[in-house]
Amino acid sequence: MPSQKKILVVTQHFWPENFRINDIVEGFLQDGIAVDVLCGLPNYPKGEWFPGYSAAGPFEEEWHGARLYRCKEVPRRGNTSVNIFLNYVSWPWYAAHALHRLPGGYDAVFCFNTSPVLMCWPAIRYAKKHHIPFTNYVLDIWPENLYSVLNVKNKALRAIAQGVSDALYKKADRLIAMSEPLQQRLCQRTGMPPQK
């Protein structure tokens, strides 16, 4: 009898926040796949902790049979440019430094990559260290999405943001896009064939 497959899902936003990744994880579980989720502390969209959550946790929970490993993040309080920026960089940093908390034994890593593109950094680190495939489900393309939130006019900063974004997208073994135009744009940016 084959052993049960096990997936690590990496996503800043997860239940009780209302994102499609909740349904995707339920689908994995219904297919008999064991799932651990590395996620943040719920505060989206208002930047206020959901009831029962705070900067002090909880950092481990169970949801429908999936084990949740929550990481710290700076909440988006007030949705100011500064707080959004701090939220964008804090969660990937804390998540990348919490990988040692995970029990391991995963067959693959699946990242639900909303903004920022940096969210996939912990997934890349884990997949590379453990030599397992990494799938990046891309919802927002960067740095274009960044420019819709922050007014970045400096050409050097824009070039750096483009280079970092492209490098992170190229680290995936498989890219999944939300739409056909987004898939075409990712293929154009990364040089990956459409079936990837």
Q: What function would you assign to each model-found segment?
A:
Residues 176-177, 183-196:
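Helix-loop-beta element that forms the nucleotide-linked donor phosphate-binding surface
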Residues 118, 125-130, 155-177:
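Membrane-proximal helix-turn-helix segments that form the acceptor-binding/catalytic region
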Residues 111, 177-178:
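Short beta-strand scaffold positions
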Residues 39-103:
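A conserved catalytic-core segment of Leloir-type glycosyltransferases
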Residues 35, 134, 194-195:
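Hydrophobic anchor at the start of a short beta-strand
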Residues 6, 107-108, 174:
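Structural motif
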Residues 18, 85-96, 108-145:
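An aromatic- and histidine-rich active-site surface loop
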Residues 1-64:
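N-terminal subdomain of nucleotide-sugar transferases
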